[in-house]
Amino acid sequence: MIWAINRNKILKNIIELQNITVFQQRNKVFDNFSLSLEKGQNTVILGPNGAGKTTLLKLLNRELYIVENENSSIKLFGKGRWNLQELRAHLGVVSHHLQSNYSNNALGLYVVLSGFYASDGIWQHQNFDTEHIELAHQVMNLLGIEDLKSRQFSTMSTGEQRKFLLARALVHDPEVLVLDEPTSGLDLRACFQYLEIIQDLMSMGTNVILVTHHVNEIPPEITRAILLKEAKVVDDGDKAKILTSKTLSKLFDRPIKIIKENGFYQALPG
């Protein structure tokens, strides 16, 4: 079997939230919150710390649940109820938080294979056949990390680890690639390399949701921007109209000057 991006899998919107209320422990995070992420639309969710971005990701991954009431609903890929393992087969998630979840002796290949089960390692009850292993090798080749497959994950550079987490997210050909602050902790060289890879994937048809508080890691291929602040959508629409000095100054409560060059954005003190 040859690994390839299936551009035609998504039949429904990625997520549809209607008038939801969400608590984390005893703290109400979302109240009467609504949002829809559409199929095939590369989207950035941008906001300061504490805006609700992480909560939104946890809803997408079903790590959190809404308060059930008559007027609220949540649908993921058109369905209200999911088997958790089946849902996560539709998603590929890359987050810098995952890097510390793997044991010190985990090899690069094992990190990639764990993507078939959306687990933080491989376990005895998990079965991997020759097709799984071949797909893992193909994705590692695509990302240029095949020669690191037998190295311990803990000994790799941050940039190398992030590429293996990307391979883990892609190996099962998910319908949506979710990037949670993907360049956090990377130096400039690794950051630019990583963004180039993401751009290539989007040009191949990968549907991306990017969650960040940095405008500089928003690739040109992103078309929609959603601004979150204090767990509310304060702006939503075409990226070029949303990512302006005026809107981002209001979002981050300080004067900001936005510069755009070669399709990328840069934020400077206003």
Task: Please state what every model-predicted region is.
Residues 127, 152-156:
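Conserved ABC ATPase signature
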Residues 113, 128-148:
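Conserved ABC ATPase "signature" region
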Residues 177-181:
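Catalytic Walker B motif of ABC-type/P-loop ATPase nucleotide-binding domains
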